[in-house]
Amino acid sequence: NFFTVYRPEGEATILPCTWHQTGISLWGHIGQDWKYQLQFLAGLNALSFNRDNWIKKGASSAFEFEPANKYAVALRIDNYSIPGLRLGISGYYGHSIDNSLGRDANGTAAKLKGAVTIGSVDFTFNRFNWIVRGSFDYGHLGDAEKVQLLPGRQTKISPFNPDPVSKTAIATGIEAGWDLFSQIARLHQDNQKLYIFGRYEYYNSYKASGTQMKFPYTEKNRIAFGFNYYPIKQIVVKGEYSHRFLKSAYNNEPSVSLGVAYEGFFL
């Protein structure tokens, strides 16, 4: 869950949203305080990587199936030892180059890996009428400077973005909200909640390295303030004011957003 009207902007910029992949998953608990998930998955497609979204579009496919010439593994561990606090760590590793339907097993791309490595730590604190969440994501792409030159990216009729792709990307953010209705007995007894929240995040989808051209506009800081009103447990009405800060050569981007969401799936 998240307080903002839209998904956390940094993670939604560089990583696939609602990331579903074909594969095998094992999960379970160790005692009462530990939870684990281990997955063996189809790899991403480097042809769909781009400057503004890093690997985000690599999980999508133009077909009703996903080519799986390359594979990936993912691991997540959560700890619940402290009441009200969840601490999580996760990692992903997989190859992405030459993972398409029309692959050339004897071509130059077959000699490249395009290894995607992602590490993440996150936490949620939900106690004393406060909810505090934070996360840090860091990603690395092997053979990044060669992804732009892959066969199929530079032709005029190519459906893929011809822009360069960064070797590294980063997204981090923290948000905190306090339930105002916890101080109003009648509304609290009626299970209504009104969280007043603030959020800060920093992200960069293209951290240029080596001889790569620099694009400073991809580095952004963002703040948001707003409310989440729960008339009933599963329904939330959200409103926020946000301000995106870019480098001095670019205009900052303020915005106002309103939304209604159903959270029953995540309960």
Please give the residue ranges for each predicted region.
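Charged, low-complexity intrinsically disordered terminal segments
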Residues: 78-79, 88
